[in-house]
Amino acid sequence: MDLLSALTLETWVLLAVILVLLYRLGTHRHGIFKKQGIPGPKPLPFLGTVLNYYKGLGRFDMECYKKYGKIWGLFDGQTPVFAIMDTEMIKNVLVKECFSVFTNRRDFGPVGIMGKAVSVAKDEEWKRYRALLSPTFTSGRLKEMFPIIEQYGDILVKYLKQEAETGKPVTMKKVFGAYSMDVITSTSFGVNVDSLNNPKDPFVEKTKKLLRFDFFDPLFLSVVLFPFLTPIYEMLNICMFPKDSIAFFQKFVHRIKETRLDSKHKHRVDFLQLMLNAHNNSKDEVSHKALSDVEIIAQSVIFIFAGYETTSSTLSFVLYFLATHPDIQKKLQEEIDGALPSKAPPTYDIVMEMEYLDMVLNETLRLYPIGNRLERVCKKDIELDGLFIPKGSVVTIPTYALHHDPQHWPKPEEFHPERFSKENKGSIDPYVYLPFGNGPRNCIGMRFALMNMKLALTKVLQNFSFQPCKETQIPLKLSRQAILEPEKPIVLKVLPRDAVINGA
């Protein structure tokens, strides 16, 4: 007998009731935005609006802004997400209500010991880490690190010279990825790694494995859709980060700590040593204690995780723009030559004071901020500028969309470093330009990242010019990943400085 015809009326009724209950369960929060008249794409039961992310976060946010205006509602699974483009509201979230309501970032799954990282930690724990780590990023400390980073700039120049001699196009991410890796491993752990020439080095391999991330990874997606799975995964010892990489760094930090206990190492300037020395001046015992081994590992790993992609991708984007805008490339080289005649070695003060270099880097970060969004979790009910945001909701600030808003940036898709000249910079609203966030929980490594990128650009542009080639994708198209990166690797021709620039 056919299975369907064998089902009784009572069974059909029961199935219908179950389906209705499942539908109600999967849509029970969908009224949050309707009640306030907040527009947004139609969510699906349980999934919410996450399927739209396949377009790429930046592109999707741009579409939503054009369609719905400065505020719209999304659902990541069943988590309500308030997307805001209003600058006063952004200021309230990032600054005014930071400590009271919007202190924390969203959980993104079972992270193991990485829950101790400064960018992941919450409330008082985050405050303690921030206070302990902030002295590591003062201008004085950065000046001490500058010579360490400069030696990797020299290695970068040497490698590019070899590539230029072959006449073959160069993949920017490969070159600057290796540079970023070397700088971060050296400044984080005091380890000298030549990633370009030793890609099989265990430190390089474990770090690269750590950096692999996909927004549509089943584990990550399952936590986005069903946050209640996170504690279950943690009980099962399942982690978003590769365990062998974390174990490798745990062993390494423990070994290094043992060798650095004597006083002769206390004047080293890598982050690991500075963290070993770190103490908070607070009289409170909990916040006064130095970082534990686990906490040091978490901070070291997050420095790598955050710094590698930011530096390598941004440098690749900068050189793409310079190659396709030869007049801007020439003007920047003239500034560098004027500040450092006859290819003089750069110094911290000279590099950080170059105005046009700063303008070029800022405009690149406007067009291509590495993070498509900034997010904060609402930890208690609040009414913000007439908008009710319930506890547990997420507020997202679509950075990419803000940076491309024609209301704030005339001809936003065009590359114009003059937007950030001394004459124009003062008129820029600080809440429409957010490559490193803003407020108490902005990127703690911002100054280090800027110094690192400016030094690399200075060394490279002292020696080379860059041109598009047939492999260069023009115009550049972006991938659909959560982290902003090109659809195809940026490939450019590298020429010694005495070559003529014929850029497209």
From Swiss-Prot:
<keyword id="KW-0256">Endoplasmic reticulum</keyword>
<dbReference type="Pfam" id="PF00067">
    <property type="entry name" value="p450"/>
</dbReference>
<dbReference type="GO" id="GO:0009822">
    <property type="term" value="P:alkaloid catabolic process"/>
</dbReference>
<keyword id="KW-0503">Monooxygenase</keyword>
<dbReference type="GO" id="GO:0005496">
    <property type="term" value="F:steroid binding"/>
</dbReference>
<dbReference type="InterPro" id="IPR017972">
    <property type="entry name" value="Cyt_P450_CS"/>
</dbReference>
<dbReference type="GO" id="GO:0008395">
    <property type="term" value="F:steroid hydroxylase activity"/>
</dbReference>
<dbReference type="GO" id="GO:0042369">
    <property type="term" value="P:vitamin D catabolic process"/>
</dbReference>
<dbReference type="GO" id="GO:0005789">
    <property type="term" value="C:endoplasmic reticulum membrane"/>
</dbReference>
<dbReference type="GO" id="GO:0101020">
    <property type="term" value="F:estrogen 16-alpha-hydroxylase activity"/>
</dbReference>
<dbReference type="GO" id="GO:0042359">
    <property type="term" value="P:vitamin D metabolic process"/>
</dbReference>
<protein>
    <recommendedName>
        <fullName>Cytochrome P450 3A2</fullName>
        <ecNumber>1.14.14.1</ecNumber>
    </recommendedName>
</protein>
<dbReference type="GO" id="GO:0019899">
    <property type="term" value="F:enzyme binding"/>
</dbReference>
<dbReference type="GO" id="GO:0020037">
    <property type="term" value="F:heme binding"/>
</dbReference>
<comment type="function">
    <text>Cytochromes P450 are a group of heme-thiolate monooxygenases. In liver microsomes, this enzyme is involved in an NADPH-dependent electron transport pathway. It oxidizes a variety of structurally unrelated compounds, including steroids, fatty acids, and xenobiotics.</text>
</comment>
<dbReference type="InterPro" id="IPR036396">
    <property type="entry name" value="Cyt_P450_sf"/>
</dbReference>
<dbReference type="GO" id="GO:0050649">
    <property type="term" value="F:testosterone 6-beta-hydroxylase activity"/>
</dbReference>
<dbReference type="GO" id="GO:0008202">
    <property type="term" value="P:steroid metabolic process"/>
</dbReference>
<keyword id="KW-0472">Membrane</keyword>
<dbReference type="GO" id="GO:0006805">
    <property type="term" value="P:xenobiotic metabolic process"/>
</dbReference>
<dbReference type="GO" id="GO:0008401">
    <property type="term" value="F:retinoic acid 4-hydroxylase activity"/>
</dbReference>
<dbReference type="GO" id="GO:0008210">
    <property type="term" value="P:estrogen metabolic process"/>
</dbReference>
<dbReference type="GO" id="GO:0042572">
    <property type="term" value="P:retinol metabolic process"/>
</dbReference>
<dbReference type="GO" id="GO:0016098">
    <property type="term" value="P:monoterpenoid metabolic process"/>
</dbReference>
<dbReference type="GO" id="GO:0005506">
    <property type="term" value="F:iron ion binding"/>
</dbReference>
<dbReference type="InterPro" id="IPR008072">
    <property type="entry name" value="Cyt_P450_E_CYP3A"/>
</dbReference>
<dbReference type="GO" id="GO:0006706">
    <property type="term" value="P:steroid catabolic process"/>
</dbReference>
<dbReference type="GO" id="GO:0101021">
    <property type="term" value="F:estrogen 2-hydroxylase activity"/>
</dbReference>
<dbReference type="GO" id="GO:0030343">
    <property type="term" value="F:vitamin D3 25-hydroxylase activity"/>
</dbReference>
<dbReference type="GO" id="GO:0042178">
    <property type="term" value="P:xenobiotic catabolic process"/>
</dbReference>
<keyword id="KW-0408">Iron</keyword>
<dbReference type="InterPro" id="IPR002402">
    <property type="entry name" value="Cyt_P450_E_grp-II"/>
</dbReference>
<dbReference type="GO" id="GO:0042573">
    <property type="term" value="P:retinoic acid metabolic process"/>
</dbReference>
<dbReference type="GO" id="GO:0005737">
    <property type="term" value="C:cytoplasm"/>
</dbReference>
<dbReference type="GO" id="GO:0034875">
    <property type="term" value="F:caffeine oxidase activity"/>
</dbReference>
<dbReference type="GO" id="GO:0032451">
    <property type="term" value="F:demethylase activity"/>
</dbReference>
<dbReference type="GO" id="GO:0016491">
    <property type="term" value="F:oxidoreductase activity"/>
</dbReference>
<dbReference type="InterPro" id="IPR001128">
    <property type="entry name" value="Cyt_P450"/>
</dbReference>
<dbReference type="GO" id="GO:0002933">
    <property type="term" value="P:lipid hydroxylation"/>
</dbReference>
<dbReference type="GO" id="GO:0004497">
    <property type="term" value="F:monooxygenase activity"/>
</dbReference>
<dbReference type="GO" id="GO:0070989">
    <property type="term" value="P:oxidative demethylation"/>
</dbReference>
<feature type="binding site" description="axial binding residue">
    <location>
        <position position="443"/>
    </location>
    <ligand>
        <name>heme</name>
    </ligand>
</feature>
